[in-house]
């Protein structure tokens, strides 16, 4: 089977099916959306990553945060088909307490080296299948792929036409889905159910908005919360849908209910039950100056290298967060790709909004537009960028939207940059995700440290990291023991006298004043007698005298003579032991001294030994 310019053998198919699950593998291979068709998002919320990160990385008042958050965005394939494609996402690894909770229900398998190789191989094949190249294949740089990362990274390659898969069905019906027991339930909410269960996800929530579907997951079992659903829907809906929500809040105070008591969240983004004030999520005001609220602006849509159609014309789509209503699925489904298309707002009276009527933006050709009524944005040569401050009421917000869309200023033409085909992991980012890339770099740095440690440890029992750390600890302990032994031996060689001298020098209360040598000169007849006296500590032969004392040998007489450049010092000693024993004792004493004394000892022996025998 040739798919995506790759030949997949039966072994490759079995490997991919074992990692992704049979249903997910068949879904990707079924060709619901051609693997060779890149997707272009209709609208590009530049603040989307921050919103998803807050849901995952910032716990709420109850110290809860989701394990992953994905936004499935309305996208258009190269063939013009409208699908829900990967918009952006964020994930984190389960905490220790969360893992214990999952293990009670699901026996998590241990990832061996073979399983890791299979996961990396599957990610590489998926990357190539969807038009990627070896140069930008991030799977080659992954050290280890966890269950959560495998589920998250594999999800990037899925897309859902209307009515297919969990996100497609949810968006088509306008009804949310909340599963609190996904691990034990037999319901497969999506083709990715096998991957979600492998990652230990107990709670799965799919929340439709007017621009896509928000998918949330947690390894904890979370009860359904209507307030949380409304907050998330308000946060991820387009700006104009929030304006309509404020109008609807003054009319309908009771939420509309569907069959089965399941509150319906309409595709238009209207939430029928709202409280007074601005919508909030996790305590953040959506209409305040926080990062949840982006300034209203009209920007040039990003040009894609593949958006040239049969007649050479381009299909522009405006930013969903820039004040223009992103078209719903039904609005884009009947668009003909023959002529350039623009979005404009018909002159709708203000009372229509107050009566609950929906303000729609229609698709039409340029030749049918009236200059006074159209809201035109030229995506080919100029860009309009009018910034409007956040409004405080419905009337001012509506007027600000119209004003921002009518004022156009000429801008520089953006330089076209060639892009590689294939689906990027997120909107305009080369890395799969910031936190995934950071984790990969941390592991690479840790591995480099282990490689360096392995190079300096001489004896390695096993090649795994735990054994390497144990061997390194044993080696360091051995080196410390050798150091202590060498220090002890050095202290013994210094001798007890040196230690006593060092101790006396360190103690301020026992300072010894070392006197210089006393010189006495006497003249008698024709001779001059010179006597030099000094303390034993300062005498050059003090160590020899000390050796005699330690050997219990008395010095009877000492003679000094000089000749031929050599000084001879002769000692006449007396010992209580035998002559042979005295000789051996002196030889042993002199041999234990420093190198200088050992070099001097043979000469002394020649002087001393004849005096003994």
UniProtKB/Swiss-Prot annotation:
SUPFAM superfamilies: HLH, helix-loop-helix DNA-binding domain. Residues 430-479 form the bHLH domain. One of its GO terms (molecular function) is DNA-binding transcription factor activity. GO terms for cellular component: nucleus. It is found in: Nucleus. Induction: Induced by wounding, feeding with herbivorous insects, infection with the fungal pathogen Botrytis cinerea and infection with the bacterial pathogen Pseudomonas syringae pv tomato DC3000. Residues 444-479 are annotated as: Helix-loop-helix motif. Keywords: Jasmonic acid signaling pathway, Nucleus, Plant defense, Transcription, Transcription regulation. Residues 48-130 are annotated as: JAZ-interaction domain. Residues 394-417, 427-441 have a biased composition (Basic and acidic residues). Residues 256-285, 391-441, 490-513 are annotated as: Disordered. CDD domains: bHLH_AtAIB_like. SMART domains: HLH. It comes from the Eukaryota. One of its GO terms (biological process) is regulation of defense response. Residues 430-443 are annotated as: Basic motif. Residues 260-270, 495-512 have a biased composition (Polar residues). It holds the Pfam family bHLH-MYC_N. Interacts with MYC2 (via N-terminus). MTB1 competes with MED25 for binding to MYC2. Interacts (via N-terminus) with JAZ7. Transcription factor that negatively regulates jasmonate (JA) signaling. Negatively regulates JA-dependent response to wounding, JA-induced expression of defense genes, JA-dependent responses against herbivorous insects, and JA-dependent resistance against Botrytis cinerea infection. Plays a positive role in resistance against the bacterial pathogen Pseudomonas syringae pv tomato DC3000. This is Transcription factor MTB1. It comes from Solanum lycopersicum (Tomato).
